[in-house]
């Protein structure tokens, strides 16, 4: 009988030790997770290198009037295209039909393509006001922009579409704001954000 008591006591002791070990592991995992903070809402970007969307007074460094630089295609909105100083990046600024001169509603940053005819700038690189630029990791982007996105084929899409509840959309009088971030091998290779054409 005393042998049975010893076995029960030993079994109970092992169970308690196992529970304590599991609690220690759980606490350490939760402690590590606290260091990773993510936003649960989107803070929209509205500018690239201080070139603000929907602002006719915001001009591209070195260009005061872009009406002669506008490219009109059949498949997309009219746009103006720029390169950074080292010709490693492209900035495409899209205009809406009927918009005022130099009034852009979408911005797209991508790697330089030698086939592209573009306007040179003095900017070292292109980045948004929240610090988003080509080459950052998906993890870093999510830390900055938040975790409320839809991911499809290596593209993270953030969207604000509730006009009735969004002071941001109301301010710009636009129905939908979007931001799309394309990744290749966990590196950001394309940024496209702005307002959808109504």
Positions of PLM-derived features:
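Bacterial signal peptide processing site
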Residues: 33-35
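Post-signal peptide N-terminal segment of mature Sec-exported envelope proteins
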Residues: 40-58
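A structural motif
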Residues: 105-120
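Second-shell loop/turn segments in exported
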Residues: 46, 125-132
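Sec-dependent signal peptide recognition
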Residues: 15-25
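N-terminal secretory signal peptides that target proteins for export/translocation
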Residues: 1-15
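C-terminal motif of bacterial Sec signal peptides marking the signal peptidase cleavage site
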Residues: 29-31
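A cross-family detector of function-defining hotspots
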Residues: 55-109, 136-187, 193-198
């Amino acid at each position: 009988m005393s042998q049975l008591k010893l076995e029960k006591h030993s079994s109970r002791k092992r169970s308690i030790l196992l529970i304590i070990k599991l609690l220690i592991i759980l606490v350490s995992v939760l402690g590590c997770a606290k260091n990773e903070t993510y936003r649960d809402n989107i803070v929209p970007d509205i500018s690239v290198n201080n070139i603000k969307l929907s602002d006719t007074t915001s001009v591209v460094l070195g260009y005061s009037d872009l009406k002669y630089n506008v490219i009109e295609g059949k498949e997309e909105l009219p746009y103006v295209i720029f390169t950074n100083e080292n010709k490693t990046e492209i900035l495409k600024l899209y205009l809406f039909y009927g918009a005022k001169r130099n009034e852009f509603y979408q911005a797209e940053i991508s790697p330089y393509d030698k086939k592209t005819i573009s306007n040179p700038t003095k900017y070292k690189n292109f980045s948004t006001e929240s610090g988003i630029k080509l080459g950052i990791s998906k993890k870093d982007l999510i830390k900055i922009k938040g975790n409320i996105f839809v991911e499809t084929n290596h593209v993270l899409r953030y969207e604000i579409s509730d006009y009735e509840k969004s002071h941001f959309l109301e301010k710009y009088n636009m129905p939908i704001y979007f931001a799309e971030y394309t990744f290749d091998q966990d590196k950001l290779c394309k940024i496209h954000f702005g307002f959808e054409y109504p």
